[in-house]
A protein has these predicted regions:
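C-terminal structural segment of proteins
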Residues: 1-340
Length: 340
């Protein structure tokens, strides 16, 4: 199928934002590593592409007074190499390093990684292949081939950076009608996944600075170390109590559901038993795996079976064991763990 669309490249945020009110069937183009293959496969058929590459104000990373800001057109490759990013948000740089290959990271943007399309064995195929099945929810139909009784699409969300951003309470900066607004990353992801095709003009990502003593880690497992999407990824953050503020534990797991899964019950149990975590270590690990099994939505994937996927859940138990050990030893690792 031959794709035909108009192409524009505005040089300002205001000029680009005007298309939100004047066009309906269009897409903003960042790195293009997710969008362009979908256009090629006929999954997206825009009448207009708005390239954001000429807008200089969308580039750059800045250490602001209350947090670290990453422009919407900053690539994952730059996020990996940038000294300030590795100083202020090294766990995010680590997760960016795990995405795909160097060639893709040099094009793909952080915002694009957040707003990537969910993938499914029955959707991400050639147009000729898709003609052999009834259109599913993602293609305008009324069925999910992964689970015919499901009332919603069950395609997994594979972003490697999203669990980290969620664990760090990050926000996205959105431009709309002449104003900049901050929205929680979690709310934006849900609007993107469960919305009705609304367009967002995101200008960057803001990560608040953590309290002193914060510890965080990112883990990932894939069939191959590069190129493949994760079979499972997770981000864990612990912030100790300081000056009357209570402790914070965030546990988010990706690639196991249509959106990242928060293990809130496990985190609450850990906070309620901070002084006994070493003795309760095995129970914590067991609770985490059980909660993940309960909240996950596992489906058939191209490179891994449901059974193999479920066996990878032990990775979450491993990183929680690492966290408990660090807490007991009072190890003040670089707050966001290891940088690449």
């Amino acid at each position: 199928m031959r794709n035909s669309f108009k192409y524009v490249a505005p040089d300002s945020i205001r000029a680009a934002s005007e298309y939100l009110s004047t066009e309906k069937n269009f897409f903003f183009l960042g790195g293009g590593t997710d969008l362009l293959p979908q256009i090629k496969w006929g999954l997206k058929q825009p009448s207009l592409l708005v390239d954001l590459g000429k807008i200089e104000s969308l580039k750059g990373m800045t250490a602001r007074e209350e947090g670290f800001f990453i422009g919407a057109m900053e690539t994952l490759g730059n996020l990996v190499k940038n000294p300030e990013a590795n100083r202020y948000v090294p766990v995010l740089s680590q997760s960016a390093f795990c995405v795909a290959s160097p060639q893709i990271r040099n094009r793909a943007t952080l915002v694009g990684n957040i707003l990537q399309e969910r993938r499914c064995f029955y959707v991400n195929q050639s147009e000729y292949w898709r003609q052999s099945v009834v259109p599913c929810f993602k293609l305008g139909g009324e069925v999910c081939h992964q689970s015919p009784r499901s009332q919603t699409c069950r395609a997994p969300y594979y972003s490697d950076t999203a669990p980290v951003l969620l664990a760090l309470d990050a926000q996205v900066e959105q431009y709309d009608k002449g104003t900049f607004e901050l929205t929680a990353v979690q709310d934006m992801i849900r609007s993107h996944i469960h919305g009705r095709g609304e367009k967002f003009f995101l200008t960057g990502v803001f990560i608040p600075y953590p309290r002193q003593g914060t510890w965080a880690r990112f883990i990932r497992q894939g069939v191959r170390g590069a190129m493949d999407f994760a079979s499972l990824n997770a981000a864990v953050r612990y912030t100790p109590p300081v000056n009357g503020s209570g402790p914070v534990i965030r546990i988010f797991v990706g690639a196991s559901s249509p959106e990242p899964v928060e293990l809130r019950e496990t985190a609450d149990f850990m906070i309620a038993n901070l002084s006994r975590l070493l003795d309760l270590k095995e129970e914590v690990k067991e609770r985490a795996v059980k909660e993940l099994i309960k909240k996950s939505v596992l489906v058939r994937e191209t490179a891994i079976s449901v059974r193999a996927k479920k066996s990878s859940f032990y990775l979450v138990a491993n990183v929680l064991e690492e966290l408990i050990a660090a807490m007991q030893l009072k190890v003040q690792v670089s707050w966001a763990g290891l940088s690449p």
